[in-house]
A protein has these predicted regions:
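Conserved acidic functional residues
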Residues: 44, 91, 134-135
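Active-site micro-motifs of SAM-dependent methyltransferase domains
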Residues: 47, 72, 113, 138-139
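Hydrophobic side chains within alpha-helical segments
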Residues: 50, 94, 136-138
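Alpha/beta-hydrolase
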Residues: 152-153, 165-183
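Active-site loop/oxyanion-hole signature of alpha/beta-hydrolase fold enzymes
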Residues: 19-22, 29, 57, 67-107, ...
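Flexible "cap/lid" loop of the alpha/beta hydrolase fold
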Residues: 118-121, 127-168
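Conserved HGGG/HGGXW glycine-rich cap/lid loop of the alpha/beta-hydrolase fold
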Residues: 24-78
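Alpha/beta-hydrolase fold catalytic core
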Residues: 1-39, 60-63, 100-103, 128-129
Length: 183
C-alpha cells in the first residue's frame, strides 16, 4: 500500500493514481477515452488491477476502463481486520462517485464478481447500469451446503492459520509457527 516501499512494485506502463475515499486510498488506472462507456474492473481476492493489464488495450477500444486495487491490494491502503463485503463495496460506491462520476458497467473476477453482485444490489440508484460476474464464489462459504464440503470446511482452517501466524496480507509473519501448528 501507500506505506510500502516503491521498490516492492514494478512499472506496469500505466499511470497509477490514488483516490481518497475518506477512509482509504484506492490505487487505480484509467485507460480509454472519456466519451466511451465507463467500465469498472474489480480484481479477485489478493489480486491487483495488474491482472487486467493485458485486457486493457482491447477493452479501451470500446470503454473507458477503470481498473482498481481494492483496500489491502496493490498500492491501496491496508486495513487489517476491515475486509468485509460492505467495506469493500462502499469503497467502490465512493470510487464510482468520486472518480468515474457517471453510470458504470462493472465486471469482477472471483471475489471481485461477488463485489460486482454487491454493487448490483447496493450501489446508489443509477450508478451501475450493467454487471458481469466472472466465476464468483457466491455459495462457496455456505455453512451447510446441499452437497459436499463448503469452502469454510475445506480451506477455512488454512485461512485461520494464515490469519493467526502470517498476519495481514503482505506481511511476513511467523511462517515456522504456522507450519508447526498445521495438522
Amino acid at each position: 500500500g501507500p506505506h510500502a516501499p516503491d521498490a516492492t512494485y514494478v512499472d506496469h506502463g500505466y499511470d497509477e493514481r490514488l483516490f481518497d475515499t475518506g477512509e482509504v486510498q484506492l490505487n487505480h488506472v484509467v485507460v480509454g477515452d472519456a466519451d466511451r462507456p465507463a467500465l469498472l474492473l474489480v480484481p479477485g481476492q489478493t489480486e491487483s488491477w495488474w491482472g487486467y493489464e493485458a485486457a486493457l488495450p482491447p477493452l479501451a477500444e470500446h470503454f473507458q476502463c477503470f481498473a482498481v486495487d481494492l483496500r489491502g491490494q496493490g498500492r491501496s491502503t491496508r486495513t487489517p481486520g476491515r475486509y468485509t463485503l460492505d467495506n469493500l463495496g462502499n469503497d467502490l460506491v465512493r470510487f464510482v462517485d468520486g472518480v468515474i462520476g457517471r453510470p458504470t458497467i462493472v465486471s469482477g473476477l472471483s471475489s471481485g464478481g461477488v463485489l460486482s453482485a454487491w454493487l448490483s444490489a447496493y450501489a446508489k440508484r443509477g450508478q451501475i447500469v450493467a454487471a458481469h460476474y466472472e466465476d464468483p464464489p457466491l455459495f462457496a462459504s455456505e455453512v451447510n451446503t446441499s452437497t459436499g464440503p463448503s469452502l469454510r470446511h475445506s480451506i477455512g482452517p488454512v485461512f485461520a492459520l494464515m490469519s493467526k501466524y502470517r498476519g495481514d496480507q503482505w506481511s511476513v509473519g511467523d511462517w515456522d509457527g504456522m507450519l508447526a501448528a498445521a495438522p
